[in-house]
From Swiss-Prot:
Organism field: Shewanella frigidimarina (strain NCIMB 400)
Residue(s) at site: Transition state stabilizer: 77
Keywords (A to Z) from UniProt: Cytoplasm, Decarboxylase, Lyase, Porphyrin biosynthesis
Pathway it works in: Porphyrin-containing compound metabolism; protoporphyrin-IX biosynthesis; coproporphyrinogen-III from 5-aminolevulinate: step 4/4
EC number(s) recorded for this UniProt protein: 4.1.1.37
Name of the gene encoding the protein in the UniProt record: hemE
InterPro entries: UROD/MetE-like_sf, Uroporphyrinogen_deCO2ase_HemE, Uroporphyrinogen_deCOase
Protein name as annotated: Uroporphyrinogen decarboxylase
Main location: cytoplasm
Quaternary structure (record): Homodimer.
Record's function text: Catalyzes the decarboxylation of four acetate groups of uroporphyrinogen-III to yield coproporphyrinogen-III.
Protein family: Belongs to the uroporphyrinogen decarboxylase family.
PANTHER family according to UniProt: METHYLTETRAHYDROFOLATE:HOMOCYSTEINE METHYLTRANSFERASE RELATED, UROPORPHYRINOGEN DECARBOXYLASE
SUPFAM superfamilies with a match to the protein in the record: UROD/MetE-like
Keyword flag Lyase: yes
């Protein structure tokens, strides 16, 4: 593998000195870019794009050609794991992801098999190795998975949900069934992420998109417990370097201290958390990623510049900060505004790293 030329992102996650604050964007390869839309149309549908290693590589690299980003993130989807378990993933116009065979009974859960990442998910591994080769050491490659709780919400609900009624009914009326599902998912995610590392990813992120829907105690029982199991099972060294792990619970500001106890290297923050306060709470244990409101990218470049300056000032001096949005970039954002955001981070952050 080519030697890494820009390791700013990895260094910040490990709280090592950097010259400027590194920056990347969740969903940086996506629908806000006209060049992405062209490749998406060529692929035919979203999962066909994910399953084609060359096209997945192309859309992963597109934002790096436009912007001075400090990391690439594998183009894929969190629902690849349940899809590989045989649930029949499809996307319905205006409705988002759906499953033909939801896992909403104990019998359905018992029948689930843990997928082989080099077989049922081999297309993801081919994409990883292709992207890593094409990056040629320019920036690190981030791999990822959904958290067991978040994957389970889609599997039990049969798709997206605003109320999470079915999975919460299972959590409180049939907790043993849900724990069986979460356990299988945690085992699957460990294998999946370790295979990503073996094929070339240099950092890992676990997206707990729906952890914030849980009550204070239920979060620990049904979400954090299984992210802990994953962290404990991950390959943490490859290519002679540590492979940093970031946990991100959207709406998880209540639980930063508990999340930091898992042994992860960094926590992602959504935009509802003050990053300076988060640093005071857990900055002695973990690095922090975030956390500008993605909707701020609809503002003028001047206003974006001000917001970046405010977040950098709130975090303060020193390393341990990876700048990002507090969630994925919106599809209708002007690409020029995304560029203004990235340039502002590099331009304004140097003074915090003297």
């Amino acid at each position: 593998m080519a030697e890494l030329k820009n390791d700013r992102y990895l260094r910040a996650l490990l709280k090592q000195p950097v010259d400027v604050t590194p920056v990347w964007m969740m969903r940086q390869a996506g629908r806000y870019l006209p060049e992405y839309k062209e490749v998406r149309a060529q692929a035919g549908d979203f999962m066909s794009l994910c399953r084609n290693a060359e096209l997945a590589c192309e859309v992963t690299l597109q934002p790096l050609r436009r912007y001075d980003l400090d990391a690439a993130i594998l183009f894929s989807d969190i629902l690849t794991v349940p899809d590989a378990m045989g649930l029949g993933l499809y996307f319905e116009a205006g409705e988002g992801p759906r499953f033909e065979r939801p896992t909403d009974t104990i019998d359905a859960i018992k029948k689930l098999c843990i997928p082989d990442p080099e077989d049922e998910l081999g297309y993801v591994m081919r994409a990883v190795s292709t992207i890593r080769r094409e990056l040629n050491g320019s920036v690190p490659l981030i791999g990822f998975s959904g958290s067991p709780w978040t994957l389970a919400t889609y599997m039990v609900e049969g798709g997206s949900s605003k109320t999470f009624e079915k999975i919460k009914r299972m959590a409180y009326a049939e907790p043993a069934a849900l724990h069986m599902l979460l356990d299988k998912l945690a085992d699957s995610v460990v294998l999946y992420l370790n295979a990503q590392v073996a094929n070339g990813v240099q950092s890992l992120m676990i997206f707990d998109s729906w952890g914030g829907a849980l009550s204070h105690h239920a979060y620990r029982e049904f979400s954090l417990r299984y992210m802990q199991k994953i962290v404990d099972g991950l390959t943490r060294f490859a290519d002679g370097r540590k492979v940093p792990v970031t946990l991100f619970t959207k709406g998880g500001g209540l639980w930063l201290e508990s999340m930091a106890e898992t042994g992860c290297d960094a926590l992602g923050l959504d935009w509802t958390v003050d990053i300076g306060d988060a640093r005071r709470r857990v900055g002695h244990k973990v690095a922090l990623q975030g956390n500008m409101d993605p909707s701020m990218l609809y503002a003028t470049p001047e206003r974006i510049h001000q917001e970046v300056d405010q977040i950098l000032a709130s975090y303060g001096e020193g390393t341990g900060h990876v700048f990002n949005l507090g969630h994925g970039i919106h599809q209708h954002v002007d690409p020029e505004h995304a560029g203004a955001f990235i340039n502002s981070v590099h331009e304004l952050s140097g003074k915090y790293h003297k």
